[in-house]
Regions:
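Stable alpha-helical structural segments in soluble proteins, enriched in small hydrophobic residues
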Residues: 82-86, 121, 139, 224-232
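Intrinsic disorder/low-complexity segments
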Residues: 1-36
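DPxDG-like acidic metal-binding loop motif
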Residues: 97-126
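Phosphate-handling active-site elements
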Residues: 84-92, 119-129, 144
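N-terminal beta-alpha supersecondary unit
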Residues: 20-22, 30-100, 218
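Acyltransferase
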Residues: 169, 212-265
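Surface "functional belts" at beta-alpha junctions
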Residues: 34, 58, 70, 125-219, ...
Length: 265
């Protein structure tokens, strides 16, 4: 069971790097205040990473890029670069919002370890956000249900359905893992498809699948920062010791068609 402590040498290195990134300087309030109003957002769930800085009024800076295996060094460098470009000091950061999955095992653990390292070193507020919520928050309300996708490899995607309520996307049912073909076969009514839509999956989708344009498919840390700041302001924050990643359950192949049908209900 994950109790929030690093379990591997790699994770300990990640946290050590994070602590070097932001030295301990202040102890912020769990609610945004004028002494530490900046939120840092980190998403490393897949090979598309993103970081952002947001204050109480605006998104100060954002950077997204395709990552390789050197997640930790690249993320730390991007965070420093954004802070320097905005003249933001470590003492001004009061919270860290982090994408907790699903996604690749290494990627999800990387972002979470960095966020925990920073939060532990400086007693920062930490907010964990599902990758699906980041994707959904970027979509326009077209009065269509949403299918948010996160690629997890081997021609499979993690899928979460959303419905619109009071102008906001709301989770509808449990998230699942589906093979591309099973997902495509399950779509029998118009639905907005967004997130990681690989070319191979795109070729299988029929006319009922309305695929979001490329800019809306990118998981951007700016949207993660927006969700995180809203939760911070309302006191809906997480415990750095117990916050854990979301890992994909392994569905049996024979179950996938049934699960796809359930998603469309």
């Amino acid at each position: 069971m994950d109790h929030g402590e690093p379990q591997t040498v790699e994770e300990r290195d990640m946290i050590g790097e994070a602590r070097l990134s932001l030295p301990a300087e202040t102890v912020p309030s769990p609610i945004p205040n004028f002494s530490s109003p900046i939120l840092l957002a980190i998403d490393t769930c897949t090979n598309r990473s993103s970081v952002a800085l947001r204050d109480g009024q605006v998104l100060r800076a954002e950077s997204s890029w395709e990552s390789d295996r050197r997640h930790t060094a690249a993320v730390s460098a991007q965070i420093r670069r954004l802070m320097d470009s905005c003249d933001i000091k470590a003492a001004q950061i009061g919270a860290v919002a982090v994408a907790i999955g699903p996604g690749s095992f290494t990627g999800v653990r990387c972002g979470l370890a960095i966020a925990k390292g920073m939060a532990s070193a400086r007693d920062l507020v930490v907010i964990g956000v599902a990758a699906f919520d980041i994707i959904a928050s970027a979509q326009p309300n077209l009065n269509l249900p949403l299918l948010t996708l996160v690629e997890i490899g081997r021609e499979r995607v993690a899928v979460q359905r959303y419905e619109w309520q009071d102008g906001r996307p709301v989770v509808a049912g449990e998230w699942r893992i589906l093979a591309w073909r099973d997902l495509a076969a399950s779509i029998d009514a118009p639905i907005w498809v967004c997130g990681d839509v690989p070319a191979g999956l795109m070729a299988l989708l029929g006319q009922n699948a309305i695929v979001a344009p490329a800019p809306l498919n990118l998981r951007r840390a700016g949207y993660l920062a927006e969700i995180g700041y809203e939760r911070w302001a309302s006191g809906k924050v997480d415990d750095v010791l117990t916050l854990t990643p979301i890992y994909p359950p392994e569905n049996k192949p024979q179950e996938q068609s049934r699960i796809g049908a359930q998603l469309m209900q």
